[in-house]
Amino acid sequence: MNIYRRYGWELALAALLVLEIGLFGLSNSRMLDINVLLFSTSDFICIGIVALPLTMVIVSGGIDISFGSTIGLCSIFLGVMFQAGVPMSIAIPLTLLVGALCGLINAGLILYTGVNPLVITLGTMYLFGGSALLLSGISGATGYEGIGGFPTAFTDFANQTLLGLPVPLVIFMVCVLLFWLLMHRTHSGRNVFLIGQNSRVARYSALPVARTLCLLYALTGMASAIAAVLLVSYFGSARSDLGASFLMPAITAVVLGGANIYGGSGSILGTALAVLLVGYLQQGLQMIGTPNQISSALSGALLILVVVGRSISLHRHLIYEWLQRRRNTVV
């Protein structure tokens, strides 16, 4: 009973995931092939890598909508470093540092100005996106071509397997474990929840609010850089638009995973399951030949239905009391 009460939403998401795969399997048997299920994750799992630290940012009462532009900037930065003759063993760590720096810029501006994080990260979204386009233009990468010619060892990395699993999926699983430990088993993770519940009280309680927020936004930036490296390896090309489509799926996964958009509550495991739920929904709809427009609409409908269902489950006692009062009034 305690497990259900503590992980009830995660169990519900897991049940929905199994049901979703089963329903799509009735229309297309390939959806039930374990190899298809495993290797199709490479098409969407990078969204999950970014969604994990984004969960912690949202739980803290913040938001970061600049990560898509950060992915594009880190992607093209990696390509420019390679073009300049910098070894990949140096270019990749530098790319991770650029991602972390983008996150720290977000945190610094939010803390210094006191402006709503949505407004700040909206501005940095255009700043990082414009910087990516500038670098792309300087390097001569135009259109969808990007910067190619990377070493075979690098381009093969994201397409290889480790212990029978695709490398991007393995990296995602490691990230889930690390962020779960950070959020649910450390003092810093506890501080994240306290800051999200009431940041003013957290400051008066001498909690390290500034340091915690800097850590969260830096981790989101670094996760964006990791996603950029994996995407460049997977596609074999560095482009400034690689993260352009990540914004809504990542936020959808975080909210669907159980995070309160106003802060104070959330779950890393819930986000991880929601990433798979949304990702396999897109994959399944593609397999049965559903147009992209309808696919996006169904994803939005799923989010609304599940969030409404969660709201009802969280406030079921209030709904029951209201129904009882209505019944007594009628009688």
Curated annotation (Swiss-Prot):
Transmembrane feature ranges: 7-27, 45-65, 67-87, 90-110, 118-138, 162-182, 212-232, 240-260, 261-281, 288-308
One annotated Gene Ontology cellular component of this protein: plasma membrane
Compartments it resides in: Cell inner membrane
Pfam families: BPD_transp_2
Keyword hit for GTP-binding: no
Membrane topology recorded in Swiss-Prot or TrEMBL: Multi-pass membrane protein
Recorded family membership: Belongs to the binding-protein-dependent transport system permease family. AraH/RbsC subfamily.
PANTHER family (alphabetical): ABC TRANSPORTER PERMEASE PROTEIN YPHD-RELATED-RELATED, AUTOINDUCER 2 IMPORT SYSTEM PERMEASE PROTEIN LSRD
Functional note: Part of the ABC transporter complex LsrABCD involved in autoinducer 2 (AI-2) import. Probably responsible for the translocation of the substrate across the membrane.
Designated name of the protein: Autoinducer 2 import system permease protein LsrD
